[in-house]
Amino acid sequence: MNLKNTIKKDIQDALIKIAIINCDPVITLNKKTKIGHYQLNNLIKIANISNLKPFELANRIILNIKKKYMYKEITFSQPGFINFLINPYWISEQLEKIFLSPRLGINHVNAQNIVIDYSSPNIAKEMHIGHLRSTIIGDVMARILDFLGHNVIRANHIGDWGTQFGMLIAYLEVKKLVNSPLSLMKLEEYYCKAKKKYDIDQLFAEKSREYVVKLQNGDQYCYSIWKKLVSITMLENCKIYKRLHVTLKKKHTMGESIYNKMLPNIIEDLKNKKIAIEKNGSTIVFLKEFKNRLGEPMGVVIQKKDKGFLYSTTDIACLKYRYQVLHADRIIYYTDSRQHQHLLQAWTIAKKALYISQNLLLEHHIFGMMLSKDKRPFKTRDGDTIKLSALLDEATERAMRLIKNKQPNLSKKKLNQLSNIIGVGAVKYADLSKNRNTNYIFDWNEMLSFEGNTAPYIQYAYTRIVSILKKSNMPIKKLKEKIFLTKESEINLAIKILEFEEIILLISQKGTPHILCKYLYHLATSFSHFYENCSILFPKKIKTCKSRLKLSILTAKTLKKGLNMLGIRVVKKM
C-alpha cells in the first residue's frame, strides 16, 4: 500500500475537477499525527498558480475528496497545509490484506532489464575497505529491484585486463613461480614487487609489455596463467561476499576482458563515423560537451600510440554490450565520485556512435568515503589500506566480546554464529544508514550500540517481538479475528507498517538505502511506543490480544524483510 501515492492521486483528481492541471502535489508525513497522518505541503504554490487563496483552494480540494472511506478527517491549517487523518477502520482492512500476503502486500512492477555494476575489485589484490560501499550499496539495490520483479543483471566489472598482468606474468616467469602454489596474499606481494621492477628495469618493462600483447592476441600460455590469477582472486573474493551476506556469485563476474575482442572494431567504427580522429599517433574523441582548462573541447584518448586501449575504450564497449546483448533498459553504476566525468564521457561517445539508445537510463550512484574519527581516510596505524577481511574479523571479535558479557553461557557454536551475524550486520548497517552521497565517520562503539539507529537495535527489536509471540503460545492460524485499532500508538504503528511499500519504491528509483534504515529505526521505535502503551499479552479482551499479536507479527515481518533487503540477518534470540 502506497499511501502517499493514493493521497497524491486523490488530490490530482480533485484539482482536475476544478480545472487545475499539471500540478505535482507534495505529500509528506505529518509530525502532528493528532490532526493528520499526512499533509499536502505545497498548497500555497498550487494556489499561486491557480490565482486562488490557499484557504479557498483547500476547501475545494477537501469538498471533492472528503467523502472517501479512507479518510477520517481532512482539514486545512495555516499558513497553507491540508491534513489527512486516515480512517482506522480503513487502515485495519489494509493490514488484514498485508497479513495474508507473503509479499507484505507489495505488488510486482512492470519489469525492466536492469544492469547493476557494483563491487568491481581488481585481480591479484585483496579486497579492501574501499570496496565495501560499492559492494553493499549495490547489493541492496539488486535485492530491492529483484523483489519488485525486475530482471536484475548483477555485473561485477572486475579489473582483469591490462598492463598489470604483463608485469605479473613476467615477474612469475623471472622468479620461476608460475607452477608454484599461489595465494592471493602472495599474488599481491608479487604484484607490488613487479611494479617496482617495472619502473626501474627497462628490460623487464619491455618483457611485461610483450606479455600484454601476447595476452591480448590470445597466446595460450599467457592466457592459462591469466586464468589462474583470476581464479585465485575470485575464489577469495567470493569468500568475502559470503561473509558480507551479499548476493554476488562467481557467475556474476563480467570483467574487462569480456570486451577485449570488441575494441579494435570500435576504434575503426568511431574513426569511420568521424567521431574519433588520429592525432600524434593516438586515437582521440573530442567532445564539445566537455571543456578543458582553455575552454576547448576535451579530448578523450581511446587508443594510445603503442596501440594499447584505455579504460574509456573498454567502458564504451561495455555499454554497447550491455545494451545490444543484455538488452538493458537501465544501467546503474556504483563507483565513487572520481569516476563521474569519465563515465559521462563514455556515455556521450556511445550515444554519438548509436551504440545505445538515447532513452537508455544511465545512472551513476556516487558515494563518499569512509573516514576515521580524525576525518581522514580510514587506514591502519601504519597508514596502510585496511583489508576487508581484517575489518570483518575485528567486527566479529568485538561483537563476540559484547555477547559474552550479556550471555556468558552460550555454546561456542552459537557464540560464533551470533558474533558473525551481529558484527558483520553492524558494519553494513553503519555504512548503509548514511547518505551514500556523503563521507561518514567510522565508529566501532556507535555501530555496535544497542541504542539508536544501529543494526543491533533493529535486530533486538525483532527478537523482542519473537519473544512476545512465543510467550503468547498462540498459533498464527488461530488469529482469525480482524485487526482493530483504538489507541494512538496502535494507529501510528499501523501507519508506519503501511509506509513500507512507498519506502521500497523510493529506493528503487534513488538507490539510497539510508532511507530504508531510517524507516526500520522508526518502525522499531513505533513498536516500542506501542509496547509501552498497549498490553499485548494481557489486555481485558481476548480479541484485543489477538489484534495486537497480529500487529506485532506484521511489525516483525516488516523488520525482517527490511533487514533482508539490506543483506542483514536476524536472530531469534540475542
UniProtKB/Swiss-Prot annotation:
Highest taxon listed in the record's lineage: Bacteria
Annotated CDD domains: Anticodon_Ia_Arg, ArgRS_core
Motif ('HIGH' region): 121-131
UniProt EC number: 6.1.1.19
Catalytic activity: tRNA(Arg) + L-arginine + ATP = L-arginyl-tRNA(Arg) + AMP + diphosphate
Any one GO molecular-function label of the UniProt entry: ATP binding
Transmembrane segments: none
One cellular-component annotation, GO: cytoplasm
Keywords: Aminoacyl-tRNA synthetase, ATP-binding, Cytoplasm, Ligase, Nucleotide-binding, Protein biosynthesis
InterPro entries: aa-tRNA-synth_I_CS (IPR001412), Arg-tRNA-ligase (IPR001278), Arg-tRNA-synth_N (IPR005148), Arg-tRNA-synth_N_sf (IPR036695), ArgRS_core (IPR035684), DALR_anticod-bd (IPR008909), Rossmann-like_a/b/a_fold (IPR014729), tRNAsynth_Ia_anticodon-bd (IPR009080)
Complexes and interactors: Monomer.
SUPFAM superfamilies: Anticodon-binding domain of a subclass of class I aminoacyl-tRNA synthetases, Arginyl-tRNA synthetase (ArgRS), N-terminal 'additional' domain, Nucleotidylyl transferase
Name the record gives this protein: Arginine--tRNA ligase
PROSITE patterns: AA_TRNA_LIGASE_I (PS00178)
One GO BP annotation of this record: arginyl-tRNA aminoacylation
